[in-house]
Amino acid sequence: MDKLLIQGGHRLSGEIAISGAKNAALPILCAGLLTADTVQLSNVPNLQDVTTILRLLRQMGLRAEQDGDKVVLNGSAIDKLEAPYEMVKTMRASILVLGPLLARFGEAKVSLPGGCAIGSRPVDQHIKGLQAMGAEVTIEAGYIHAKAKKLKGTRIVTDMITVTGTENLLMAATLADGETILENAAREPEVTDLANLLVAMGAKIEGIGTDRLVIQGVERLHGATHAVIADRIETATFMCAVATVGGDVTLRNARTDTLDVAFDKLREAGAILTSGDDWIRVQMASRPKAVSFRTTEYPGFPTDMQAQFMAMNCVAEGSSRVIETIFENRFMHVQEMNRLGAAITIEGHTAIINGVDKLVGAPVMATDLRASASLVIAALAAEGETLIDRIYHLDRGYDRMEVKLSAVGAQIQRVK
């Protein structure tokens, strides 16, 4: 099993190219199920989760050709309307095939999802929404089995803001009969990116980027060409790394309009940030100052950035409080950071971090995707050598992170 070996204490300098967004690419790839025509995608990241979803889609009969960051999809020969447990258990985003299959073919059988260990993240909002659109849904032997001759447009108010729930219901509504209104919809940029692709495919969607989406169902969707947006979480991760260890790094192919909260907190920590249309420069010459924050839905502070900013706070000047409101179990990285010498205590949904003068390298273990990224940042700041185990979590959502960091001066290598 691969591990990362990191020698800490090196400043970062140079340029890093940002990849396409994982959380946009996954639903966008599933949208290929909605049409028999060809969908051409670019800026698709090279990630384990993308490989997994493509394997699942191919198993259903979707043709998918991949060349670098380009993927060409064709859904004219789909012959299997099932997502089996073996495929879904490794990645909960597989649930995103449910809406498209049901809308286009009138039936879908999808295993209840697996994925991260950071919380239950139930799919009940997906199911309730599809039932409101007229689907018959049963759960038996660990599978969601949904049927509908034709989904009917309706008004859906989700009990909570759910990104994948919004995406699933949005895709289903594009081919439904009549008007669907999604209230309390997720506003994340990745949802907006999916909606923009669907419009390019012929969908009629109003309110894109707001919490109220109005969809007029159409008879069929056609092919389209689309570039996946830049990954704001990867961008923030590298920004955080520079702010933690110091240096001067320019991030290319980045989006600045989705990172307001990260900009605010990094400037509060003492980083100097400048940016253009597709680049961000991060300069840090001093020890960071501690920053407190509370995770919440977009446009608030993303839960997917929580662990990385906590790593920065570990070596920051002062004390900070981090309140996690989205997922339970999302402080699993704390124990590993404390092994490196951090001073973090947990009180319910709040982590209290007292910045220390230095971290010291030690063997640690990644527990989930963003936790693994936070351990990389902490290891870059630590004195001596850190060995991070179970980095398959990292590969799920970061495109060759160690290669990108090595290019800007980090002493990091992948070992067996």
Swiss-Prot record:
GO terms for molecular function: UDP-N-acetylglucosamine 1-carboxyvinyltransferase activity. CDD domains: UdpNAET. It is found in: Cytoplasm. Pfam families: EPSP_synthase. GO terms for biological process: cell division; cell wall organization; peptidoglycan biosynthetic process; regulation of cell shape; UDP-N-acetylgalactosamine biosynthetic process. One of its GO terms (cellular component) is cytoplasm. InterPro entries: Enolpyruvate_Tfrase_dom, Enolpyruvate_Tfrase_sf, MurA_subfamily, RNA3'P_cycl/enolpyr_Trfase_a/b, UDP_GlcNAc_COvinyl_MurA. Phosphoenolpyruvate binds at K22, N23. Its main location: cytoplasm. The keyword Protease does not apply. Pathway: Cell wall biogenesis; peptidoglycan biosynthesis. HAMAP family: MurA. Cell wall formation. Adds enolpyruvyl to UDP-N-acetylglucosamine. This is UDP-N-acetylglucosamine 1-carboxyvinyltransferase.
